[in-house]
Amino acid sequence: FIICANNLGSCYGTTGPLSINPETGKAWFSDFPTITIRDMANALELLKKELKIEKIHTVIGSSQGGQIAQEWAIMFPGNTNNLILIATNCVHSSWGIAFNESQRMAIKADPSYGENTDEGGAAGLQVARSIALLSYRNYATYDVSQRERRKKTGYKAAADYQQYQGEKLVKRVNAYSYVRLSEAMDSHDVCRNRCKNHEAGLHKIKANTLVIGVTSDILFPIEEQQRIADSIPKANFATIDSLYGHDAFLIETEQ
């Protein structure tokens, strides 16, 4: 059977900022504790034990999910037979952290973020989504995907697309979860407080591993996946050749 679990801090059912703080009887909102990728991996291990699963056939993780999958495999070696890591890294880059901080700045610049309501920070979250899209795609992606729209609607096609994506996200994600999840991504470092270098951290992974990178990914450059594959003892490396950047793993399903 297949299990797709919500991550700690998310807004899809697992404990997160809209959950009730037992000490106050009210939702956490911006007071929700800072969490790390390792916290998320520990939460998945608790779920595994609750479901009485002794061994996992395959763990699949992409982007932040790939970060969690690595930590899970390092913290609990022998947990899974196989590991598939897609468009991810072993330590979150300064480039990625800068993108995440820019998004958080946009959210916190929205005065409603400090009001601690379900809709708090919604306008800022729309801007954050627009910033994020620029890192998920690239110049060629926009040039190709907006070409036909631009012929029909004029030069505002790309601008309208950014607005649309921002409006769509706020219908399913709250700003407080977005902030905490992005902070967790920034914390990712398989070497932190456990080894001298990242290669040594990755060497602890015992599972058969397939690492997949996207040729045009500017957020998680393909060199980051190659580094992972080179450092895990039983790893193979593959690529998705696409102009869709980081989002290619969601789009290029045939590959």
Which residues make up each language-model segment?
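Short beta-strand/loop motif that positions the catalytic acidic residue
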Residues: I205, V211-G213, D217
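Catalytic histidine-centered segment of alpha/beta-hydrolase-like enzymes
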Residues: A238, L243-E254
